[in-house]
Amino acid sequence: MASAEPLTALSRWYLYAIHGYFCEVMFTAAWEFVVNFNWKFPGVTSVWALFIYGTSILIVERMYLRLRGRCPLLLRCLIYTLWTYLWEFTTGFILRQFNACPWDYSQFDFDFMGLITLEYAVPWFCGALLVEQFVIRNTLRLRFDKDAEPGEPSGALALANGHVKTD
């Protein structure tokens, strides 16, 4: 029998970092289209986003594992949103000390120090919902089989309709 193991925290951090980076690029491209009708959809971000999103989503994963049986979904998403604001402010504040903060929300009506803005509350809430329901839950289901050979799945763990066979 194969020895499939859950992904390590570093592996999950990597997946979360890539996911956050991709979403940041897509969000900025969509924002550019909605605000400026730019059909080029130029999405931008910073390499700092890899660390910021990877770490933040890994912490949200820990929150999810502790809260999932105790808190309703919408309350968890509110908690994740508050965490996101705290994390965005903290990382932005630190990066600003080195003139390296890649965002500036000063032009928004409800910004605080240009580092966070209330206008993003709904997108952050929706993002938290999607992260919990799809990204974290599916990432926690992934397994690493250290004995598997590269290539197509075969044997007892061959895929059948997207599900792992266990018989």
UniProtKB/Swiss-Prot annotation:
A family per Pfam: ABC_trans_CmpB
Membrane topology listed for this record: Multi-pass membrane protein
Keywords annotated in UniProt: Membrane, Transmembrane, Transmembrane helix
Cytoplasmic-side positions: 1-14, 62-73, 133-167
Location of this chain's protein in the cell: Membrane
Entry's transmembrane regions: 15-35, 41-61, 74-94, 112-132
Domain of life where this protein originates: Eukaryota
Any single Gene Ontology cellular-component annotation: membrane
UniProt topological domain (Extracellular) ranges: 36-40, 95-111
Main location (coarse class): membrane
Family statement: Belongs to the TMEM229 family.
UniProt name for this protein: Transmembrane protein 229B
Organism: Bos taurus (Bovine)
Gene behind this protein: TMEM229B
